[in-house]
Amino acid sequence: MKTLEVKTSSATYPVYIGDGIKRNIVDLMTSTGHSYTKLLIVTDTAVDAIYGDEMVRLLEQKWSVHKVVVPSGEQSKSFAEFEHIHTKAIQFQLDRSSCIIALGGGVIGDLAGFVAASYMRGIDFIQVPTTLLAHDSAVGGKTGINHPLGKNLIGAFHQPKAVIYDTSMLETLSQTEMRSGFAEVIKHALISSEDFLKELMSIRSLDECSKSELAHMLYQGIEVKASIVQKDEREQGVRAFLNLGHTLGHAIEAEYGYGVITHGDAIAIGMQFALYVSEKKLGLSLHRTELKEWMKKLGFPVQVTQDISTKTFVDRMIGDKKARGGTVQFVLLKQVGDAVLQSFTKDDLHQWLDEWKREEGCL
């Protein structure tokens, strides 16, 4: 088992990564030093079918445990499910000494974390990620739900008390889900280290990753995320670099429809656009074509479809929560491991997106 400590201005908590460590979840939770009256497991239908009963059985060794199950998919990051979980928490008589267990992927972590942040003005929660994608979202304290007009527009910063990452649970993921999570690993490499990126690009198939390779990759990705969050918990500065590819990526998700395209696939396209602009505007020296072809071989889409106009995407980006006064704070790379923020107007975005689409043959 690997252990990593996350330190922010508001909290310090451990991240445990290992094969089969869910069997020790009671000991791991107890070791944090927090005492709980009741636990509420929040999970989705897909995860519940595989791990729900086992997790209840493990946690009931020490605590009174309740469970609420929401539909699988991005659609559950909604006002309706947010209210539904609150209703269950009230019915189960959770108090301020209770704890919510987020058992699932990024959707569950965001949703359950936001419930924890708001229920009785804030109770503890613990992340138990079951997807590769959640290696990014489980650390850092961002919680929230979507609005029909945009992704993650309603939420709060609320750090977990621990992250318990059992890599054996990744074995049940589909190829699509693994790829979605791997996009965030690529992002962490791009903003941190040429060596990390080269290591990733030696992977020819996600199916070929051994458990030890997977744990090592996750540790590196989480280490990058933790080091940034420790410097900037509330995204006033360098934490914004974690949004590489996310401005267009979120626009793609919102426009295509949440759940129609995976988060990782949308971010993969967004990163291709960001790297194009970085190359043209900042002189980024990166074998962009080589990276694009490698990502295509892994199954990623690398360009937008022709049926949605540039204006539609630009309007979505201007409405993004990272926009300021009609301009978008866009993450670019001077070089691998050296990210910067650039302000783009609506006209700037339209020009760059048109030029990129023209190069890709999808204008």
Swiss-Prot record:
Coiled coil spans: none
Protein name in UniProt: 3-dehydroquinate synthase
Reactions the enzyme catalyzes: 7-phospho-2-dehydro-3-deoxy-D-arabino-heptonate = 3-dehydroquinate + phosphate
Pfam families the record matches: DHQ_synthase, DHQS_C
Entry's Gene Ontology cellular component terms: cytoplasm
Family: Belongs to the sugar phosphate cyclases superfamily. Dehydroquinate synthase family.
Protein localization: Cytoplasm
CDD domains, sorted: DHQS
Record pathway: Metabolic intermediate biosynthesis; chorismate biosynthesis; chorismate from D-erythrose 4-phosphate and phosphoenolpyruvate: step 2/7
Gene3D superfamilies the record matches: 3.40.50.1970, Dehydroquinate synthase-like - alpha domain
Protein's job: Catalyzes the conversion of 3-deoxy-D-arabino-heptulosonate 7-phosphate (DAHP) to dehydroquinate (DHQ).
GO biological process: amino acid biosynthetic process; aromatic amino acid family biosynthetic process; chorismate biosynthetic process
Keywords, sorted A to Z: Amino-acid biosynthesis, Aromatic amino acid biosynthesis, Cobalt, Cytoplasm, Lyase, Metal-binding, NAD, Nucleotide-binding, Zinc
Domain of life: Bacteria
